[in-house]
């Protein structure tokens, strides 16, 4: 411990010790004795909470298991699947995970146990992965082979299985168990979308006379019963106490005093790496990971570090994960991409830069990653100059208690989001062909009437049944359940032959070509629309894993966008700041509340972002200026480019677009009006 904080002792506010916990074990009698043999072969004993969950499952109950990180939740469904497979080999199982990385990780674990299961029983459970990475040929193979277990994402359940449910009747008619892992991530707009994705699934299964069971797995929630009721409109049995052993942990709170934030993080990381301590360093944004990585370019431990982001190609992420597992890399600078349970081997320490925007929620998940193999763990928070950080600095004991208990207290899901509800009701009507109007709640009936006014569906009285029914008129366009856009943006090394090949590909060929480019290392990152406008407009510098790139031209082919980039000297010190304006129009007000003299509105907004250019600052702007001039000379960058220098060395480049870039979109939002307060201030 002393070595970890050597040279930064004065930055420590407080260190807490979280005591170790002993495990409690129990036994369970499976239908088939081979499963008990499998447990023996795996070399573990069942924890008491695993046995409680299994008892509920075997009594035909829906179950939510909300226990601490690394408490063996996944073992519950794996054992239940293997057991039921021996008795009912035609049953099917759908396993939902929020990320592809987590699916790959869990599929690997399932496959390892499946091999042991085969050695014991001479039978193997057929399991497949269905994600956006899976090509058309493999998808056809899945439909032909009809695996027992399907690992998939919420997105593929929405886009693929429900949209094309006639192709998946072999799965849906025989679906015995739906497993939803990492349930706690289903919050915010994503959570609202998932309420309706699950509603569509359950209504379809009801049509198919399938009353399946649901098993949900989650980090520790304060209100699990209410939360799963909100998501599924079903009653669940709750298992919410962990009986797995837990190692001793330390929680250290640091605040930059004599050092600035970057210097403190650097010293801390260097001390941890010098002591061979495997560490994750969490940041709120991808940009922050890259900024610190660049600050560490001349550090003695630089080659033991890497950034890790969800935007990196799959093969790059897997390469980083493997190097971290075997100790070639000792510290990862990451975002929430590693917040979930991806297996990266033993982990000794977690640093979080500040309190995350969602408060303690993410801290609990991140800190749960360290000390997962009966080893002591060190959790560190480096406070920022931020409102939330200031609050917890003044309430350290509250922070400690909430982390120690590991309970996520608040899960915001708004089930009355009109925009989301309207989309999913249209999908539902399209998928089921006919929907009983009276099966909808009052809010949904109101939305359906809007859809009828828009000419998308028809409400009519069935003369035979005398029921009011809804039929589809216009096919819906399926959009993302995570973002407002379905478009994909790829940052690619600039090679002329790639451009010519892309322009001659069909849509189905493009997906295969993109995967080939990823494997060959030409794809630097895959980003979303927001990140493109934020960081990758032509001429802007972009950092990835410590390397420096300059964004060049972009070509768009339907929903695919390709930004070409050149790699520059990684040691150049440059940074871009955008020049933009924002205009907001209020389209609709859904709700209004008042607090004292403040009016709080919730409604629909139209946002217009006007990008006028950007500024580049840093030590090496002279060199970067030449790169920008080359882009202009080649007709790639249509802008006025000026280099400004002053006596103090505060040099910068101003890039002003000759044609402003405009981005329009609609979103739900909250806004405040406090006219009376402002009026009072002006009066004074």
UniProtKB/Swiss-Prot annotation:
Record-annotated Helicase C-terminal domain positions: 264-419
Top enzyme class: hydrolase
Motif (DEVH box): 181-184
This enzyme's EC code(s): 3.6.4.-
Entries under CDD domains matching the protein: SF2_C_Hrq (cd18797)
Family per similarity comment: Belongs to the helicase family.
Protein name as catalogued: Uncharacterized ATP-dependent helicase MJ1574
The species this protein was found in: Methanocaldococcus jannaschii (strain ATCC 43067 / DSM 2661 / JAL-1 / JCM 10045 / NBRC 100440)
């Amino acid at each position: 411990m002393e070595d970890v904080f050597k040279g930064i002792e004065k930055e420590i506010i407080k260190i807490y010790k979280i005591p170790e916990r002993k495990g409690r074990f129990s036994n369970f009698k499976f239908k088939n004795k081979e499963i008990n043999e499998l447990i023996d072969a795996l070399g573990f004993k069942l924890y008491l909470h695993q046995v409680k969950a299994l008892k509920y499952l075997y009594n035909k109950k829906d179950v939510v298991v909300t226990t601490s990180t690394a408490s063996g939740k996944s073992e519950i469904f794996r054992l239940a699947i293997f057991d039921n497979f021996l008795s009912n080999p035609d049953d099917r199982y759908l396993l939902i995970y929020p990320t592809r990385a987590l699916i790959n990780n869990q599929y690997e674990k399932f496959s390892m146990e499946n091999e042991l299961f085969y050695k014991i029983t001479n039978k193997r459970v057929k399991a497949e992965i269905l994600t956006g990475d899976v090509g058309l040929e493999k998808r056809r193979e899945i439909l032909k082979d009809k695996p027992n277990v399907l690992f998939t994402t919420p997105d593929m359940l929405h886009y693929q299985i429900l949209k094309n449910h006639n192709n998946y009747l072999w799965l849906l008619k025989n679906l015995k168990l739906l497993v939803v892992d990492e349930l706690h991530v289903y919050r915010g707009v994503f959570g609202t979308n998932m309420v309706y994705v699950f509603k569509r699934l359950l209504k379809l299964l009801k049509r198919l006379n399938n009353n399946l069971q649901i098993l949900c797995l989650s980090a520790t929630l304060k209100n699990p019963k209410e939360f799963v009721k909100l998501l599924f409109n079903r009653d669940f049995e709750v298992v919410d106490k962990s009986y797995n052993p837990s190692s001793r942990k330390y929680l250290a709170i640091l605040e930059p005093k004599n050092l600035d934030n970057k210097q403190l993080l650097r010293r801390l990381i260097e001390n941890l790496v010098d002591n061979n301590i495997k560490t994750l360093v969490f940041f709120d944004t991808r940009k922050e990971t890259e900024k610190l990585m660049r600050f560490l370019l001349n550090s003695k431990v630089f080659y033991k570090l890497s950034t890790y982001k969800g935007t990196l190609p799959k093969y790059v992420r897997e390469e980083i994960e493997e190097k971290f597992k075997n100790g070639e890399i000792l510290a990862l600078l990451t975002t929430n991409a590693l917040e979930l349970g991806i297996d990266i081997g033993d982990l000794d320490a977690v640093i979080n830069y500040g309190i995350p925007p969602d408060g303690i929620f993410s801290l609990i998940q991140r800190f749960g990653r360290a000390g997962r193999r009966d080893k002591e763990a060190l959790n560190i928070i480096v406070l920022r100059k931020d409102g939330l950080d200031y609050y917890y600095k003044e309430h350290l004991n509250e922070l400690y208690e909430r982390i120690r208990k590991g309970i996520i207290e608040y899960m915001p899901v708004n089930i009355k989001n009109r925009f989301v509800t309207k989309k999913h009701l249209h999908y539902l009507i399209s998928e089921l062909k006919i929907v009983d109007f009276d099966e909808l709640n009052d809010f949904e009936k109101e939305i359906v009437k809007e859809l009828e006014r828009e000419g998308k569906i028809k409400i009519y009285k069935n003369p035979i049944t005398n029921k009011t029914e809804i039929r589809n008129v216009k096919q819906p366009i399926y959009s993302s359940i995570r973002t407002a856009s379905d478009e994909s943006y790829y940052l690619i090394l600039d090679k002329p032959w790639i451009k010519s090949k892309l322009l001659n590909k069909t849509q189905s060929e493009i997906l295969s070509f993109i995967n080939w480019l990823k494997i060959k290392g030409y794809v630097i990152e895959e980003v979303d629309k927001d990140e493109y406008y934020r960081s990758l407009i032509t001429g802007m510098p972009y950092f990835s894993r410590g390397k420096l790139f300059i964004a060049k031209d972009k070509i768009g082919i339907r929903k695919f966008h390709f930004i070409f980039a050149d790699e520059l000297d990684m040691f150049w010190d440059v940074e871009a700041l955008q020049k933009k304006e924002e205009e907001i129009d209020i389209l609709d007000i859904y709700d209004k509340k008042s607090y004292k003299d403040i009016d709080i509105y919730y409604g629909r907004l139209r946002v217009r972002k006007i990008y006028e250019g950007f500024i580049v600052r840093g030590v090496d702007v002279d060199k970067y200026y030449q790169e920008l001039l080359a882009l202009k000379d080649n007709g790639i960058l249509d802008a006025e480019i000026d280099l400004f220098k002053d006596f103090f060395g505060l040099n910068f480049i101003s890039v002003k677009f000759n044609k402003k870039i405009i981005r329009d979109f609609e979103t739900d939002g909250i806004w405040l009006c406090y006219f009376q307060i402002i009026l009072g201030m002006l009066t004074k």
